[in-house]
């Protein structure tokens, strides 16, 4: 498994238990990759994602939040799947896709601490990347878009050191990254990343020892080749028997 997939796999496979956290997970997914339409059948949200596992996860989340809602259509072509979900205004209002006062796409509302943690987990799932991991611990959150303000205020609240650049946030260094992951209850990922890091160290050490041994072997071969040429000249000249016993033994 690639290093970047370790964190995503844990978050993707862990479905929240509380309904408020399920709603928060849906808010992030649909705001990032959903499109709200007005059709003859009412409001419809179309969710597209190239990763079918994330599409299935979103459908599972929606059914968990709205178990009585059955109006879902799963479509596909040769390259990807997507889902169309029809529902009344009340559904999309709860998911912060529509507001009677603000209209379409109002600000995302996250209040409870458990929901805030789930919010950050979902953003990391879709927008987080572990980069240059062989050189050092570093997590990049790319193009968080409408969630930038909430992310930055949350990191400051959690006292996680981070760096802000246009279109991305960075968390650098093992101490800060592991503190961030522990805040997200991603201890399994922390342990796996630590094992991965040790594996890389052992692998690099093995490569260095192998290169050192090969260099020594090459020097020995080169030295033997030089001696062989000298001995060949002696054999063609006076002969090995003409040498004193100590030199002949060498």
Roles of regions detected by a PLM:
Residues 36-38, 132, 162, 228-233:
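Short acidic (Asp/Glu) and glycine-rich catalytic loops that position anionic groups and cofactors
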Residues 1-42, 48-58, 62:
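N-terminal, positively charged regions that mediate nucleic acid binding
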């Amino acid at each position: 498994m690639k290093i970047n997939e370790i964190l995503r796999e844990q978050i993707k496979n862990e479905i929240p238990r509380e309904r408020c956290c399920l709603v928060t997970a849906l808010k992030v997914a649909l705001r990032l990759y959903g499109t709200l339409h007005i059709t003859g059948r009412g409001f419809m949200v179309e969710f597209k994602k190239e990763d079918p596992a994330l599409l299935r996860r979103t459908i599972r989340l929606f059914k968990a939040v709205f178990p009585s809602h059955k109006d879902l259509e799963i479509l596909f072509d040769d390259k990807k799947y997507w889902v169309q979900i029809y529902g009344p205004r009340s559904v999309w209002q709860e998911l912060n896709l529509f507001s009677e006062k603000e209209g379409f796409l109002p600000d995302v509302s996250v209040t409870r601490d458990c929901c805030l943690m789930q919010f950050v987990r979902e953003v990391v799932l879709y927008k987080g990347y572990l980069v240059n991991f062989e050189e050092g611990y570093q997590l990049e959150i790319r193009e968080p878009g409408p969630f930038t303000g909430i992310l930055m205020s949350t990191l400051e609240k959690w006292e996680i050191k981070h760096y802000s650049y246009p279109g991305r946030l960075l968390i650098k260094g093992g101490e800060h990254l592991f503190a961030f992951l522990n805040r997200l209850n991603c201890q399994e990922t922390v342990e796996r990343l630590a094992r991965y890091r040790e594996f890389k160290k052992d692998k690099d050490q093995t490569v260095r020892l192998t290169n050192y041994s090969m260099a020594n072997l090459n020097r020995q071969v080169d030295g033997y080749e030089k001696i062989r040429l000298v001995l060949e000249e002696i054999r063609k000249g006076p002969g090995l028997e003409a040498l004193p016993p100590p030199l002949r033994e060498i």
